[in-house]
Amino acid sequence: MNSITVIDAAGGMVVNSKGEYLFIYRNKKWDLPKGKLEKGEGKREGAVREVEEECGIAVNNIGARVCKTYHTYTNKGEIVLKRTYWYQMGYKGTGKLKPQKEEGITSVRWFQKGHIDAIIKNTFPSIMDVLAKMDLFTEKPVPLSE
């Protein structure tokens, strides 16, 4: 019988001063910035660190915890359960977003609430849980302009 390794991670649902939401594009899917907690690191601190590393921005504030999600995957034949703690965050800057290429992130982008439909069509079930907790499905989606 295989054992299960539990990994704790944290991430953020970042909103800028225009009310737009921050997403990353990795492995051909839209995602939220998140990552594994370092040894001895608190969940809130880890969430901020991951957002800043993966997106190249400095978070201005961190708010309440949104939710906790779970997903499983296999790594070298071992089953891994990833438990992720999600936090609301704010960003007031106007700096250029910088994807963390070494983590496989190819794009970082702000989305208006009405454009979240584009994310829904190409994301992971656990991210859908976070979006639902943030009540981002309430407005009729507007088509993305190129």
Where are these regions (language model features)?
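Acidic, metal-coordinating catalytic segment for phosphate/diphosphate chemistry
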Residues: 1-11
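C-terminal lobe/hinge of AMP-binding adenylation domains
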Residues: 26-27
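Unchanged
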Residues: 37-124
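Charged phosphate-binding loop/patch that engages nucleotide di/tri-phosphates or the phosphate backbone
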Residues: 122-146
